[in-house]
Amino acid sequence: VYDKSIPTVEAIQLFDDFLCELSKRKVQTFIISGNHDSAERMAFGGRLMKESGVYVAPVYAGKTQAVVLEDEWGSINIYLLPFVKPANVKRFFEDEQIENYTDAIRVAVEQMKLNTDERNVLVTHQFVTGAKRSESEDISVGGTDNVDASVFDEFDYVALGHIHGPQKIGRETVRYCGTPLKYSFSEIHHKKSVTIVEMKEKGNVEISTKELAPLRDWCEMKGTYMELTEKAYYENLDQDSYMHITLIDEEDIPEAVRKLQVIYPNLMKLDYDNQRTRGKAAFLEAAEVEEKTPFDIFEELYEKQNNQEMNEEQKKLIHDLVEKIWEGGH
């Protein structure tokens, strides 16, 4: 829901307005916490909100209770499974073999005791193997957060969160709807949309999408400063788009950001692509690697991907592996 565990006041107010509008329109709403959210904060007031048709998943405590809806074809059981790590599940099922994310979700699903004669829907927030990522999502080392899609086989529909690009995983009824807005320039080619799922009798699921048009789109441009500031170039562009501009001038343009923002007020990123920047990048990359040991390189990679340092046990393991490999070990 949010992009941090303690969201800004503005973000909370916006979400509150959104939920109030849905409730006014008698739209039943189902919410789970994601990997950026605080599950405890998200769950606050959940028991009160369900009286208004807003269902918030509680903090995972070893079981997932279905919300049962009724229509002319019978019951629809909606299960809300927030983002969980293997440790979150293992603490409740110490006798189960839980070594990775797939094991954790498999055990969590087994505890739901699905009635497969009825329609079952799962709302969850995990990275399912095979999904296409963008730069906006957190990535775990070596794909350790992967969940195999087979754990969802008994559900009639699985609504997934976490990946920003809309896509199906394996079958049509396991889907990421994606984010409603673009979050980085790596998503510039995404077609953002809302997924509409119509369920009739058991086994009859129709899926369609409604494309979303943002107030401001994202745009990338490349050229010389003179080219990009010519009226003939920009007069037919949406100048209010969020811009990433790459200048190819050999000399830096003084106060380029300030000058470009006169024409492109939502300039988000400015780069140069010329002989100097290409040479500097190549020199730095080669020099930095040559000066570092294999252990230093691995340690830096680990810190970048995990936002924390290795512990002493991990450091010793890597030291030993490096010594074996670089000193002729097998």
Please annotate each region the language model reported:
Residues 1-67, 151-155:
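Core catalytic region of metal-dependent phosphoesterases/phosphodiesterases
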Residues 2-6, 32-42, 62-65, 85-88, ...:
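Active-site environment of divalent metal-dependent phosphoester hydrolases
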Residues 15, 34, 78, 125, ...:
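Divalent metal-coordination and catalytic microenvironments
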Residues 23-25, 114-116, 150-154, 235-238, ...:
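Short, conserved loop/helix-junction motifs that constitute active-site signature segments
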Residues 44-48, 52-145:
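Conserved catalytic scaffold of divalent metal-dependent phosphoesterases
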Residues 50-51, 129, 134-203:
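Conserved beta-sheet core of the metallophosphoesterase superfamily
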Residues 64-72, 76, 81, 174-239:
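Binuclear metal-dependent phosphoesterase catalytic core
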Residues 199-330:
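Accessory, non-catalytic peripheral segments of nucleic-acid enzymes
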